[in-house]
Regions:
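Short beta-strand/loop element within the Bergerat-fold HATPase_c
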Residues: 75-87
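Short conserved segment of the HATPase_c
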Residues: 100-112
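Short helix-loop "hinge" at the ATP-lid/N-box region of the Bergerat-fold HATPase_c
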Residues: 68-69
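Conserved glycine-rich
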Residues: 137-138
């Protein structure tokens, strides 16, 4: 349903200046049980102001963080960072997982690629990308190499 609306471009994104810490507080209720089950912590390195639609960006960030939870070993840290440069503001989410091979990247943002725990993805990542693109943004991936974890960078262009 949400993807259909995003695909049809019928959503009016209402952008405001929001702190990264505020977005994380909004994400918390959706992920805190999963964090507890896996003994994971979220660490915010740097707080920044992001110009975005709070409701929809919270949804995108929730999906990215749920993905990080799924691929991080129990007891590890998920690092959130944010900042800005002349072209865009950004939020990054770095997991402590095994990392991702570049060949897996093609399936990452495809809808309903088999959602097994091995290397498949559901609707969450494609939805996150559609939300960012709907706001004139994008998502980049820093693979880091096998055993290094993966970093997702949500970009909000100025």
């Amino acid at each position: 349903f949400k993807m259909g609306k995003l695909d049809a471009h019928v959503i009016d994104f209402i952008k405001n200046d929001i702190r990264t810490s505020e977005l994380l507080e909004a994400v918390k209720p959706s992920v805190e049980i999963l964090l507890d089950i896996h003994n994971l912590t979220i660490e915010l390195k740097q707080d920044c102001i992001i110009h975005c639609d709070k409701r929809w960006t919270t949804e995108a960030l929730t999906n990215i963080i749920k993905n990080a939870i799924e691929y991080s070993p129990d007891g590890s840290v998920i690092e959130i960072d944010s900042g800005e440069n002349p072209m865009y503001s950004w939020i990054s989410v770095k997991d402590s997982g095994m990392g991702m091979d570049k060949t897996e990247y093609a399936a990452l943002f495809k809808r309903f690629e088999n959602s097994t725990n091995e290397n498949g993805f559901g609707i969450g990542m494609p939805l996150a990308l559609s939300i960012l693109k709907g706001q004139g943004g994008d998502i980049d991936v820093d693979f880091g190499g096998m055993g290094e974890g993966t970093t997702f960078i949500l970009k909000f262009f100025k």
